[in-house]
Amino acid sequence: MTNIRKSHPLLKILNSSLVDLPAPSSLTSWWNFGSLLGICLAAQILTGLFLAMHYTSDTATAFNSVTHICRDVNYGWILRYLHANGASMFFICLYLHVGRGLYYGSYTYTETWNIGIILLFAVMATAFMGYVLPWGQMSFWGATVITNLLSAIPYIGTDLVQWIWGGFSVDKATLTRFFAFHFLLPFIISALVMVHLLFLHETGSNNPMGIPSDLDMIPFHPYYTIKDILGLLIMLTALSTLVLFSPDLLGDPDNYTPANPLNTPPHIKPEWYFLFAYAILRSIPNKLGGVLALVLSILVLAIVPMLHTSKQQSMMFRPLSQCLFWLLVADLFTLTWIGGQPVEHPYVIIGQVASILYFSIILVLMPLIGIMENHLLKW
C-alpha cells in the first residue's frame, strides 16, 4: 500500500514540496532564509490577527487602543512587540535572501526572481501601512510625507494623493483604509509565496557553485528540515531577546507621542528597514527625480538578470565580483545610516555619493567586471 503522504490529493502536494523534494546536496545556511521568511509571515499573520481583535482604526481611539493592548490585554504587550520586532526580523531575512540571490546568481531563474521582487514591494507596502496604525507622531507624519510623494506624478499626482487620503489630509479615512489594506495584503502575499514556490520547483534550487546539480540530489526531509529548524531556533533566540529585553530598540520614541497635525517632529524618518531607500530619495533635490530613484532602488533588481555578463552563474569563484558585491553591502549600510541622519552637511554629500555608487555598482560595474573576468579566464 502506498504511503498516505504520497497518495492523498492534498498531502502529496505538501510531500512533493516539503518532504520528498529533491534538493542539491551542497546548500549552505544561506538557503535557510526562504523557510524563515515563511515562518515570519505565518507569525506576523497570527500576531496581527490577535492584535486586530483589540485595535480600533479610528483617529480618536487608535493610539489609546494600542496602549490598551499593552496594558490591559492578557499578554498583549508580547503580541504587540512580537509583531513590531517580527517585522524587523522579516526584513532582515528578506534582505539576506535577496543578497543570497544576487551573490549566487539565483536571479537567472527569472520567473522566481520577478515574483520575489513583487513580493518585496508587497511586504514593504504592508510594513509601511502597519507603521501608520499606532497613530503616533511618526505614524502620522510618515504617512503624510510618503503618500505626498505621489503628488510628484505629473497631471494626476494631486488628485491621486487626495484619493488615497480620502480627503484633503491624512485623517480618519486614511487610517481606516490603511488598516483594511494592512489586514488584507499578508493574505495576498501568502498567495504570491505559493506562486514563488511553484516557479522555484519548476526549475529546482540553485546551489552555491552555480552548476547543474541533477546528479547529486538529496531529499529535503530530514536533511534540510533539520537545518531549517536550527535556523529557526537562532532566529527565535534573536527575536525573543529583542522582544523581552529591548522591545523599543528599533522603534522611534516619537511614536509614543499621539499624532498631532499641528506639531511636526524635528526629523521625520521611516523604520530602519526603509532608511536606505529613504536616503536615496533624499539625495536627489528634485521631487519627481527622488520618487523615481526611490522606486528604482528596488526595481533595479528586475534588470539584474539582463545585466549578467559572466559565463559563471555564481560568484563563488569570481573574487573581483565578490569584492564588488561586498562594496554594495557596505554601501547599503552607509545609506541606512545616512537615512537616519538630519539633512545637513556632511550627510547630504555622503548620501549622494552612496546613492550614485549603489546604482553604478549594479548597472555598470558588475556587468563590466563580469566581462573582465571572462577575459581573465580566457573564455
From Swiss-Prot:
Residues at which heme b b562 binds: H83, H182
Listed GO biological process terms: mitochondrial electron transport, ubiquinol to cytochrome c
GO molecular-function terms, A-Z: metal ion binding; ubiquinol-cytochrome-c reductase activity
PROSITE patterns: CYTB_CTER, CYTB_NTER
Binding site for a ubiquinone: H201
Record's subcellular location: Mitochondrion inner membrane
The organism's place on the tree of life at top rank: Eukaryota
Cellular-component GO terms for this entry: mitochondrial inner membrane; respiratory chain complex III
Binding site for heme b b566: H97, H196
Binding note for cofactor: Binds 2 heme b groups non-covalently.
Major localisation: mitochondrion
Family label: Belongs to the cytochrome b family.
Assembly notes: The cytochrome bc1 complex contains 11 subunits: 3 respiratory subunits (MT-CYB, CYC1 and UQCRFS1), 2 core proteins (UQCRC1 and UQCRC2) and 6 low-molecular weight proteins (UQCRH/QCR6, UQCRB/QCR7, UQCRQ/QCR8, UQCR10/QCR9, UQCR11/QCR10 and a cleavage product of UQCRFS1). This cytochrome bc1 complex then forms a dimer.
Miscellaneous note of the record: Heme 1 (or BL or b562) is low-potential and absorbs at about 562 nm, and heme 2 (or BH or b566) is high-potential and absorbs at about 566 nm.
Role noted for this protein: Component of the ubiquinol-cytochrome c reductase complex (complex III or cytochrome b-c1 complex) that is part of the mitochondrial respiratory chain. The b-c1 complex mediates electron transfer from ubiquinol to cytochrome c. Contributes to the generation of a proton gradient across the mitochondrial membrane that is then used for ATP synthesis.
Official protein name in the record: Cytochrome b
